[in-house]
Structures are given as structure tokens and as C-alpha cells.
Amino acid sequence: MRLILLGAPGAGKGTQAKFICEKFGIPQISTGDMLRAAVKAGTPLGIEAKKVMDAGGLVSDDIIIGLVKDRLKQPDCEKGYLFDGFPRTIPQAEAMKEAGVAIDYVLEIDVPFDAIIERMSGRRVHVASGRTYHVKFNPPKADMVDDETGEALIQRDDDKEETVRKRLDVYSQQTRPLVDYYSNWAANGDASAKVSPPKYRKIAGLGEVDKITASVFDALK
């Protein structure tokens, strides 16, 4: 099972990725984790990436694809892998295809932006314990106060509506085009590609988590 999970920030990809990886016995691969591991291990690509990051630059797609190819040679990828947050752009997707990285499924978790804004901007957190509430779906007993300690809850900067909207704007411009890219490749093929086209599946990400998970597993049959 080799797949890419697509969806906007706050669509629930992380939750479903965990269930998918457990069911199929595959690792969840994130470029951030790969970069940190390569830098720590002092691999040639890691050294190259560290120079770029230390200078405040963005690591090139060539380096990222090199890290991906190295990562997929690891024994835990024998049964497959799940890409988390990669590719983010069309050039990265093209580079993956050119590098011959095989993908069986591209799964999109679709949640309307207004629902994501409500879901994320309503979160409130008790910092010391990590307990999380939601003003609408799981409110504390007393407004902005932790149920167990009576201490104040906060809204993280990442969850503020303005920040959420900015992240969704970036997603719309950079990553959303991947939906069309992969659905077109799945439907029409690409004679020049080194790998077979993936199957493209789209599921609704609203509702109870277990029902969404059931839809995910049905889509991956």
C-alpha cells in the first residue's frame, strides 16, 4: 500500500494517516522528519540540506526527492508507505513521477473550508496538561476554564481564524492543484511516466471519525 494523502490543513489527515499506517503496517513519511534524520546522521544529502537551512534558504526539490528515494529503501517501506505533507506542489509531484516513485492510491479528504475554519478556530487548550476543548463541539463546563484545574484556557496562534484563513489560502494556491493533477493522471494515464498511474479516491471528511475511517478503508480496497 503506497499512498499520498491530500487535504487542506485541519481536514483530519493526521488522524486518518495513523489509522491507515496501523492497518497496513506501513510508515508515515514526512519530509520534515526525513530532513531532521538526514541532518542528524550527517548523510551527504543531510549535509547539503543543513547548509541551505543554516543560510535561511528553502531546501530544493532535488534534495527532497533524493531523501525520499533513500527513505524508501529502508526495510520498513517493504509493505508500502504513506506520504504526509508531500508532495506540496506540482513540480514536486512531477519530480516524484520522474524519479519513478510508485504510488498506488492518492486519497483526498475533502472538507469545506468554512467547516475547517469553524473546527480549528474553535479549539481551546489547557497548556499544562494539553487537554483540548472546542467552543461548539466539546466546550468546557465554564467558559475558557479547564474542567479539572480551573485554570485558564488559551487559543493557540495557529488556531486563530486569521492564521487558519492564511494557511487555507496557501493550500489553495500551492497544494490544491495537486487534486486536479493526480485525478487527471489517474483518469487519463501518462505514456511517458516511469510508473503506473495511481488510483484517485475522494472521501468526505465531515462526520464521526470512525465513519470517516470506514470510508477511507473502503476507498483503499
Swiss-Prot record:
Catalyzes the reversible transfer of the terminal phosphate group between ATP and AMP. Plays an important role in cellular energy homeostasis and in adenine nucleotide metabolism. It is found in: Cytoplasm. It catalyses: AMP + ATP = 2 ADP. One of its GO terms (molecular function) is ATP binding. It comes from Cupriavidus metallidurans (strain ATCC 43123 / DSM 2839 / NBRC 102507 / CH34) (Ralstonia metallidurans). The lineage of its organism: Bacteria, Pseudomonadati, Pseudomonadota, Betaproteobacteria, Burkholderiales. Its EC number is 2.7.4.3. Pathway: Purine metabolism; AMP biosynthesis via salvage pathway; AMP from ADP: step 1/1. Monomer. Belongs to the adenylate kinase family. Residues 122-159 are annotated as: LID. This is Adenylate kinase. Disulfide bonds: none annotated.
